[in-house]
Amino acid sequence: IPQCRDVKESGQPNDKCRCNGKPCTVGKCTIARGDDNDKCT
């Protein structure tokens, strides 16, 4: 599982992945893409 800060998704704030509909800069996404239903853990 990639670290959220290592997942870049264009169009998201600061190119961070999105977990649970919010930009995530720490922890891990359970889904690499950081979809709306993702969790930041």
From Swiss-Prot:
Residues in coiled coil: none
Is-annotated flag, keyword Metal-binding?
A: no
Q: Which InterPro entries match?
A: Ornatin
The record's subcellular locations are: Secreted
Q: Which keywords does the record carry?
A: Cell adhesion, Secreted
Highest taxon in the source lineage: Eukaryota
The UniProt annotation puts motif Cell attachment site at 33-35
Q: Which Pfam families match?
A: Ornatin
The biological processes this protein is annotated with in GO are: cell adhesion; regulation of blood coagulation
Q: Name one GO cellular component term.
A: extracellular region
Q: What does this protein do?
A: Potent inhibitor of fibrinogen interaction with platelet receptors expressed on glycoprotein IIb-IIIa complex. May prevent blood from clotting during either feeding and/or storage of ingested blood.
Q: Which family does it belong to?
A: Belongs to the ornatin family.
What's the protein called, per UniProt? Ornatin-A2
Q: Which organism is it from?
A: Placobdella ornata (Turtle leech)
